[in-house]
């Protein structure tokens, strides 16, 4: 299964849906699945806290990948690769597997921190559930190092969606190129 990871606003859902359409594949967005099963993510966080959300989200991931419907492409939640190791009994091994899989792609507007932060904040503030610019900047700065530190291939998304899709298809066809 192809898995797209990265911060909120990196383009995981848009690019995942376009990639699925181009490949005739099945696409799932973990945030959309969470919302369908558990309700609004912000409300869930307010009522239960981040740790409960992360635990539920990892459990949902396993339910989906182990379920009866085969998934070809999945966009993971923005913080999925940054949860605490003990959040779920199988999370540490899963995170290690995802980080090193040739079918996992880290989507970032740029691999340069300042360009990435600026673009993520700009994109996130256009969303209806956006936090303040300061909070969005804090979140991406905290998570950026984790994303660029993953051994999975990084794909910059400050280009047309079709160009990103073409890059993903080429990488999948040719193996991992770093």
Question: Where do the protein language model's features map onto the residues?
Answer:
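The conserved Walker
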Residues: 8
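Short glycine-rich anion-binding loops that position phosphate/pyrophosphate groups of nucleotides
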Residues: 77-81, 110-112, 160
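Residues at the beta-strand->loop junction immediately N-terminal to the Walker
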Residues: 5
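Glycine-rich phosphate-binding loop used to anchor ATP phosphates in small-molecule kinases
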Residues: 52-101
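A glycine- and Lys/Arg-enriched "phosphate-lid" helix/loop adjacent to the NTP-binding pocket
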Residues: 98-145
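Conserved glycine(s) of the Walker
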Residues: 11
């Amino acid at each position: 299964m192809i898995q797209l990871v990265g911060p909120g606003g990196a383009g995981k859902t848009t690019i995942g849906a376009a990639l699925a359409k181009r490949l005739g594949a099945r696409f799932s967005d973990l945030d959309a699945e969470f919302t369908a099963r558990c309700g609004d993510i912000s409300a869930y966080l307010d009522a239960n806290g981040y740790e409960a959300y992360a635990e539920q989200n990892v459990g949902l991931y396993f339910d989906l990948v182990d379920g009866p419907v085969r998934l070809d492409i999945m966009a993971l939640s923005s913080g999925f690769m940054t949860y605490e190791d003990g959040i779920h009994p199988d999370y540490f091994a899963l995170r290690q597997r995802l980080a090193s899989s040739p079918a996992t792609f880290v989507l970032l507007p740029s691999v340069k921190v300042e360009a990435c932060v600026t673009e993520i904040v700009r994109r996130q503030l256009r969303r209806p559930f956006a936090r303040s610019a300061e909070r969005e900047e804090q979140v991406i700065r905290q998570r950026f190092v984790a994303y660029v530190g993953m051994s999975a291939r990084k794909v910059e998304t400050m280009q047309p969606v079709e160009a990103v899709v073409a890059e993903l298809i080429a990488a999948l066809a040719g193996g991992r190129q770093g």
